Amino acid sequence: MDNTLQKIGVVGCGLMGAGIAEVCARAGSDVIVVESNQERADAGRGRLEKSLRRAEERGRLDSADEVLGRIRVVTELGDLADRDMVVEAILEDEGAKVELFKQLDEIVTSPDAILASNTSSIPIMKLATVTKRPSNVLGVHFFNPVPVLKLVELVPSLMTADETVERARTYVDGELGKHAITCQDRAGFVVNSLLIPFILSAIRMYESGFATAEDIDQGFVLGAAHPQGPLALADLIGLDTTMAVAESLYAEFKEQLYAPPPLLQRMVDAGLMGRKSGRGFYTYDS
């Protein structure tokens, strides 16, 4: 078996998918990104171009065009047939991810190819068991913004082969220049199991009228040396994503600290998703 991962596929070209595609292409990999329709594909391509041009202008990249030349954005999952690893980066919806993994299992031809998920909360076992290659299914969870943050969580299920984990680790650490940690296959993994209760506590404090959003956030920026406060961070993550992760954690552990506050549910229902919608706990310019 050739253990190297050279041909990478990414499903989804939103904020996370585009970031994953960018860092893989910047590392020299051949990357194919799949979006659900041409409009989304064009938007994803534009997102990649904007990010890479900005990196070039800031002197962090020699040639944006060279990196863009290693990325194809398409609309057919079948184009992923020859990939060494495919990273799923679609919406945080268990049913949608399960269906996608069923399709990828039929499409990706190499029996050694890794099928990876960028899920931030869904147990990997639920995705692995719908494939005929559960030993090659792994969580590979990047953090937003992907080109900036170094951490990647590697999440093997009980059925993931040790060799699969090590191949992914070699790529993440060696090729991408990031730092991989390994964590158990439980909802939220390491970072979100700690982060989400912190954010939810801040939302409850704001909801109760205990303090303003600005004062809550400034308390942690100026008093705890955090780069940003919990409510601004929730806006950056996306309130819909924060809600989905909280629901997944609460469903698995039934602990009150993971229960989404009513205000968070109302904001998501109203379409107030944070930065990506222009309004969350703060208002943002388009």
Regions found by a protein language model. Give the residues of each.
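NAD(P)-dependent Rossmann-like dehydrogenase/reductase catalytic/cofactor-binding core
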Residues: 2-4, 29, 163-166, 173-184, ...
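Rossmann-like dinucleotide-binding cores of NAD(P)H-dependent redox enzymes
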Residues: 33-65, 156-164, 180, 187-194
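NAD(P)+-binding Rossmann beta1-loop-alpha1 motif at the extreme N-terminus of oxidoreductases
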Residues: 1-51
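Hydrophobic/aromatic beta-strand patches that form the interior of the parallel beta-sheet core
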Residues: 32, 72, 87, 138-140, ...
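Amphipathic alpha-helical segments at domain termini/boundaries
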Residues: 8, 26, 65-85, 167-177, ...
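Rossmann-like NAD(P)-binding element
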Residues: 39-40, 54-114, 122
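Rossmann-fold dinucleotide-binding core
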Residues: 114-184, 192-193
